[in-house]
Amino acid sequence: MKKKVPKFIEQSLARVANLYSFEPEHHLEKIDESLTPNMRALRLAMTIAEQLLSMGVVARDVVRMAQGITRTYCRRPVHVDVSYTLVTISQDRGVSHEPLTMARVIVPDDPNYQLIQALQLLALDIRRKQLSLEEAEERLQQILKKPTEHSRLVVYAAGGLVSAGSVILYGGSLLMASIAFLLGFLATGLLRWLGRIGAPLFYSQSLVAIFVTLVAAGAAWCSNYLGLSVNATLLVISGIVLLVAGLMFVGAFQDAIDEYYMTANARLLKVVMATGGVIAGVMVGLYIATKFGVTFPATPDRLTLADGHTQYLGAGIIAAAFVLRNHSRFFGMIISALIAIFGWWISRLAMSFGFDIVTASGIAAAVIGLVAVMTSRLWKFPSLAIIAAGIVPLVPGLSLYNGLMGVVLYPPNSANFLPALAILARAILIGVAVAIGASFGNIVGRPIRRQFINLFRRNTQIS
């Protein structure tokens, strides 16, 4: 009788046989890696849009740049859509070809004003049909291969100068400005380190705000034993200005006005969370300091802590240091300082005519936005940088501090608690007025600049 081989042995032998089966190889045709000029143009527009959006450029400007590039190199029209973390380019190529859609995820990054200007000039040259597709691709590759950046020490020192300029703006002494510089240097380094390790923005802002407040309290405590005059209030205000200065609240309002609502909502929420982190950190720091017996001097909620010339010097230092912190060139620092001084003068002038500080700040921001849009191409410096630097001195650091100090010191049933909330609300209103004013100036300046450009081109053709 023939014994039956177990089934598992048959399966194992079958697997062994399959291992040594020699079947003819099938030569698969590989996909051609070369791209059509149309796809290369779409990729070029997508890369420029991705870089600009990651650095906070307004969505409408990015969409117009991308469409200008595709109109130059593509036969079929292209639709560009932005939703803060995603940019999409779609092209309908007719009934005989499949539609094309490209999408990229936007990873937020710190602004680099030299990189922004280089990309904007590239897009402008493409729209003017001054570059072939090959030349544009090569130029983009060179721009992104090695973007111009300042060293970390320069960036940290720029953060220190922002804090020192804030102290000078409010009439601080040279000693106070030196302490604020060191504090801003360390705070900028801590903020960058938290960003590198992936800490969420809210907690990064909170931790740095706590650090600034406690260092200010420690400086005030040490000054009592050393016989030095150190105003901890000004140190905290300089830290608040440093932390709030980098927020893109003007761009968020601009996106909302331009009807890019998803992008605007995301950016506005980011600004709210970052500002909330600063508020929470300062409140925690003030609470800890008061528990250890360190008292902060009361500061009048008026900008009369320094004479006019000193205020202008402080405003110029803040603006120049702010753009230096974002990798600006030297000429951009001079422009930003002059615009900030001019904007500060406008706000003082408006207040002299009887306007309150909220309205005066909005008027100054509107003038800054108008001047930035009108002169950005002439100076070859991004209007985003001019606006951001010009409005930094208008940041309501003093009002925000006084409101937070009142909330910490007085219980809810105290008669001084509601006035503290009112001061805090006014600080928020100043920030909103500055954002709306800068956006309004930007909107008004766009058609005026377009008319000037068209007039210049007509005169050039006639001559």
What feature does the model see in each segment?
Residues 165-166, 170, 186-195, 215-223, ...:
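Alpha-helical membrane-inserting segments
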Residues 148-251, 325-326, 330:
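Core alpha-helical transmembrane segments of integral membrane proteins
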Residues 242-250, 266-355:
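Generic multipass alpha-helical transmembrane bundles of integral membrane proteins
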Residues 1-136, 142-144:
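Soluble N-terminal domains of membrane-associated systems
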Residues 224-231, 290-305, 409-421:
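Membrane-interface helix termini and inter-helical loops of multi-pass transporters
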Residues 125-139, 154-165, 181-191, 286-294, ...:
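Hydrophobic, membrane-facing alpha-helical anchors
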